[in-house]
Amino acid sequence: MPVQHGRERRHLTSHRRSAPSRSQRSQRFRVRSVTDLDLRPSILLALWLPVPSSRGAAVVEGADGAHTVLDPALDGETPLMEWMTLMGRPGRVAAVLPSPSDPLPGLGSALDAGEAVLVQTAGESSALSAFRRTCLLVPEASGTSGVWRVVDQTTQSGEPAAAVPPFDAAHARAQVHAAMEEAIEALTELDLARERPELADDLTDLITAVADPRLLPPGLDQRRRELLERSLRLLGICEIALDDDGAA
């Protein structure tokens, strides 16, 4: 399950006011608490869509209320588990984390939420469509629960406006490693530790943090899990740097 996001160095230095804080995201679409690493709703849904089950829907929904899906292919809102069943096993799926600095082609509708799930069906048709479908699921707040708004990504020519790229684990690991080095370099340049002495402890805790295994689907490949955790640590470093309005 790839996680696509813009270059983290730019996130650290250029877009503090336009990027939502961790507390703002939590208020807008709060679904769970995790042991250590923060798995956003879109990341959890992308992990569980290939193995649709009541357990997966429950993990995504958390304890704050049922989730529904607002899909133009259906009438009204559909319970998340029912939509997952109708959608069937996807051919490709990716959590995307667009930012104003790097919105990702075709995914502008996810900018406000800062996250979404890009899904491509496996076959030529499904219960929701008579043809191969590519769509974007964008999380939105709805009282104490959540709604996933489906945005079709198929253009008039029949081609997807945004396609899920093939997953290359080796390339992804190299990208995460390079981005981590950039993030640490940016933190050093910003010299945040001088004004925030607790930062070193926060970073130490984050570097050793792991994902709550109860939130992950069974059978998740160990190397993919490790890559996911490295990506989440990188994301967490960027969020720590952005917590202080004056830091960047």
Language-model features, listed with the residues they occupy:
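Extreme N-terminal basic, low-complexity initiation segments
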Residues: 1-12
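N-terminal intrinsically disordered, low-complexity regulatory tails that precede a folded domain
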Residues: 5, 17, 22-127
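Terminal low-complexity, poorly structured segments
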Residues: 8, 18, 199-202
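Hydrophobic, Leu/Ile/Phe/Ala-enriched alpha-helical segments that form helix-helix packing faces
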Residues: 84-87, 183, 187, 238
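Internal, hydrophobic cores of structured domains that mediate oligomerization or house catalytic pockets
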Residues: 90-186
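Alpha-helical oligomerization segments
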Residues: 189-248
